[in-house]
C-alpha cells in the first residue's frame, strides 16, 4: 500500500499534505471544475477530474490494490452511502459509522449510550415548551437548520423544509433543546495501533448570518447555520479531563455497538455551559473541517508528537505505523 487518495473538498488539502509528509503517493479525485485549483499544489501527485459521483467511485476503485481512501464530510454527504458501498478500495476508519452519522436519531443514541450529557429531544412537536433547534440528517454543514421558540414555529419551519424539498418527512429531523453556552467542537484521534486517544484540537464553527445577528435589531433577519469557516479555540485545562473522559466513553461505546469500533479522527460537537458542564449535541465520526485550522499542528497535537502534526498527517502516520507492524487490517474497513 503506497497511495493515499481522497475526494477534492472539505479537508482534502490537509489530508494529502499530511500523506506526502509521511512518504505516500497522493491522488486527488475531484469535480472537473476544481482541477485547475488543485493543480497548483506540488504535494498532489495525481489529479483525476470526474463528471459525476459514479465516475468518482470508478476512479477510487482504480486503486483497490495499492491505495487507501480517506473519508471526510463531502464523501459522507455528497457521494452517498449507496455509492460508498460500491467502493472496493480500502477505507481508513470504520465505514460502518457512515450510516449512523447520516441519521440524527441514531447519532444521539450513541452519545446517550456513552453516558454523555446531551440536550433534551422532543419526539412530538406538541411537547415543545422551550427554545429548540431543528436539525436535518447528514453532514450538511448546518444547511436548513432553524431555531424555534414555540411549537407553532416548529410546524411552520417543518412545512418550509418539506416545500423546499430539504426533507421528505417530518420524522427525518431531530428537534433538540437549544443549549445556551459557548460552542466548542472537540477534535479527537483514536489510535488502534497505539491504543491511545489523543485530543487533537478545538474549534468553533463560523456560521453564515447567525454570527452577525447580534449586531442587528431583533427580528430583522432569520438566523441560518450554514458553516462557512472555523475559528481556533483552546479550553481551560481543567475542562480537558472531562473532555477526555467523554472521548474515551464514546470510543468504548462505538467499539461495542458499531464494530470494529472507532478508528482515527472524530469530533464531539459541544456547548460548555457557565457552570463548566459540557453538553454534546452531535458527533462526526471522521475528520472534520475544523482541523484545517491546524495544518501546522495544534496546541494539543504538539504535546503528543513534539512536531507539526495535522490530523491529515496523523492519519497517514497511523497508516505508516500499521504498515510497519503488519496491522493494516486494524485500521481499514
Swiss-Prot record:
Metabolic or biological pathway: Purine metabolism; IMP biosynthesis via de novo pathway; 5-formamido-1-(5-phospho-D-ribosyl)imidazole-4-carboxamide from 5-amino-1-(5-phospho-D-ribosyl)imidazole-4-carboxamide (formate route): step 1/1
Keyword terms of this UniProt record: ATP-binding, Ligase, Magnesium, Manganese, Metal-binding, Nucleotide-binding, Purine biosynthesis
Cofactor binding description: Binds 1 Mg(2+) or Mn(2+) ion per subunit.
Catalytic activity entry: 5-amino-1-(5-phospho-beta-D-ribosyl)imidazole-4-carboxamide + formate + ATP = 5-formamido-1-(5-phospho-D-ribosyl)imidazole-4-carboxamide + ADP + phosphate
Family of the protein in this entry: Belongs to the phosphohexose mutase family.
Residue ranges constituting the ATP-grasp domain according to the UniProt record: 95-324
Pfam families hit by this protein: DUF1246, DUF1297
UniProt-recorded name of the protein: 5-formaminoimidazole-4-carboxamide-1-(beta)-D-ribofuranosyl 5'-monophosphate synthetase
GO biological process, one term: 'de novo' IMP biosynthetic process
EC number: 6.3.4.23
Enzyme class name: ligase
One Gene Ontology MF term: ligase activity, forming carbon-nitrogen bonds
Positions in coiled-coil regions: none
Function, in words: Catalyzes the ATP- and formate-dependent formylation of 5-aminoimidazole-4-carboxamide-1-beta-d-ribofuranosyl 5'-monophosphate (AICAR) to 5-formaminoimidazole-4-carboxamide-1-beta-d-ribofuranosyl 5'-monophosphate (FAICAR) in the absence of folates.
Residue numbers binding 5-amino-1-(5-phospho-beta-D-ribosyl)imidazole-4-carboxamide: 10, 74, 230
Residues that coordinate or bind Mg(2+): 269, 282
Binding site for ATP: 125-185, 207
Cofactor(s) it depends on: Mg(2+); Mn(2+)
PANTHER family: 5-FORMAMINOIMIDAZOLE-4-CARBOXAMIDE-1-(BETA)-D-RIBOFURANOSYL 5'-MONOPHOSPHATE SYNTHETASE, 5-FORMAMINOIMIDAZOLE-4-CARBOXAMIDE-1-(BETA)-D-RIBOFURANOSYL 5'-MONOPHOSPHATE SYNTHETASE-RELATED
